[in-house]
């Protein structure tokens, strides 16, 4: 697919240009690109193309508060806004203090398939402000911890 005449915005600045996509990946970016025979062409004049966004503080509310937001509705909103990675806070019910809870959210996000989702785990077990032993049992793919608005009040806990 060839996207032509888009306003390209990136770290280098703004310019009009084209984007050639092959096999679902950007193969070329530049001005005056030509479509291969039979490739669809999209005229993006008046539209903006830019790198995806990352949101490090989201609330998908799973588990326990799905009446506010689910992994699917949150993923849809993120993707629609141009976000390809979101990081969900652990203030859920139960509090996301285990690898199993975090993994279930991330598995659901993979099933939905709209953006990459990381589920934070609480710094202290169930936001109790003291217990951190649960962190030793976390799998390596859990990359972020947060007390999300609670704060850790004791320096020796940190």
Regions found by a protein language model. Name each.
Residues 1-52:
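Histidine-rich, glycine-flanked metal-binding segment
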Residues 6, 24, 46, 57, ...:
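Divalent metal-coordination and catalytic microenvironments
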Residues 11, 51, 61-63, 128, ...:
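Conserved protein kinase catalytic core
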Residues 39, 84, 143:
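Conserved acidic residues
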Residues 40-42, 54, 87, 118:
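Hydrophobic/aromatic beta-strand patches that form the interior of the parallel beta-sheet core
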Residues 41-46, 70, 133-137:
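Poly-acidic low-complexity segments
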Residues 47-112:
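Metal-associated gating/positioning segment near the N- to mid-region
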Residues 92-103, 108-158:
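Histidine/acidic-residue-rich, glycine-tolerant segments that coordinate divalent metal ions
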């Amino acid at each position: 697919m060839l996207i032509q005449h888009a306003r390209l915005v990136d770290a280098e600045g703004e310019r009009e240009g084209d984007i050639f996509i092959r096999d679902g990946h950007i193969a070329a970016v530049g001005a005056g690109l030509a479509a291969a025979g039979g490739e669809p062409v999209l005229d993006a004049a008046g539209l903006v193309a830019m790198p995806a966004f990352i949101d490090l503080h989201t609330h998908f509310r799973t588990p326990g508060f799905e009446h506010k937001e689910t992994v699917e509705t949150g993923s849809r909103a993120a993707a629609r806004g141009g976000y390809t990675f979101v990081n969900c806070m652990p203030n859920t019910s139960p509090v996301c203090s285990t690898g199993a809870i975090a993994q279930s959210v991330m598995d659901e996000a993979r099933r939905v398939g709209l953006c990459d989702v990381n589920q934070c785990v609480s710094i202290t077990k169930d936001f109790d402000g003291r217990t951190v032993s649960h962190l030793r049992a976390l799998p390596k793919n859990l990359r972020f911890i947060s007390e999300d608005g609670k704060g850790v009040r004791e320096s020796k806990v940190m």
